[in-house]
Amino acid sequence: LPYCAEQGKGVFVIDTFYQARISPEGLLFDGTFFQDPRLRQELLFLQKIPARKAMSELFRVKSDSLLWLLGRRWMAENMAVALEYSYFPAEWIPDFSQELCKIPWERLFAQRHMPPSRVEQTVQGICVYGQEALLLQIQEGSGAFLANQQLLAENHRVLRYSKILAQARKVTHYLKDPISK
C-alpha cells in the first residue's frame, strides 16, 4: 500500500518514496532498511559534542556528558535517498568508530548489553535548503520527509535519537479523501 498523509484539506498519496525503488516501508528506517543491499552509506562526520540540556534529559545522563554525533548519507543506485543525524551518549560506546558505523543500531546496542525493544518515530513533510539539499541532490525548497526517531530499550530509556531526512518522489495529491463516506 502507498503511504498516505493528510495535508490541509486533501490527502497526499506517495506512490514511491525513492527513484531507487526502495519500498515505502523503508521510511520506518528500521534495521531492515539499513541492511538493504541496494543501500550504501557515506560517512559525513563522526564527532563528540557536549550534551545540551534537552539531550541530557532525553538520554538521562549528566549535563556535562558527551554525545556521539554521526552524520551519514544513504545512497542507492548512486542517488542520495536519505541523510541521517544520530546522537547517543559517548559513555555507552566510548570506542565508537567509523568501522562500528557499519553495524545496524539494534545489533550494536545489543552487543553492549543494551538490547533495544522498539523504535518510536514521527514523520512530517518539510522543505529542504542549503547543504542538506545539496547532499540529497535535490533543488532548494524541494519537499522531503523528516523522521524524528528514538530507539528505546525495554525500560523505555532512549538509546539513540536520530533525525532522518528522506527524499520524497512522485507525489499525487487528491483534492478529496478517496475513502469518503
Describe each PLM feature range.
Residues 1-64, 94-118, 172-181:
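HTH-adjacent hinge/linker in prokaryotic transcriptional regulators
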Residues 3, 68, 145-146:
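Hydrophobic beta-strand signal
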Residues 39-44, 70, 76, 80-86, ...:
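A short glycine-rich, His/Asp/Glu-containing loop-to-beta-strand
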Residues 46-48, 73, 150:
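Residue-level recognition of beta-strand microenvironments
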Residues 58-61, 66, 71-72, 84:
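Exposed, interaction-prone assembly regions rather than primary DNA-binding/catalytic cores
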Residues 60-63, 76-79, 88-92, 97-181:
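C-terminal regulatory/effector modules of DNA-binding transcriptional regulators
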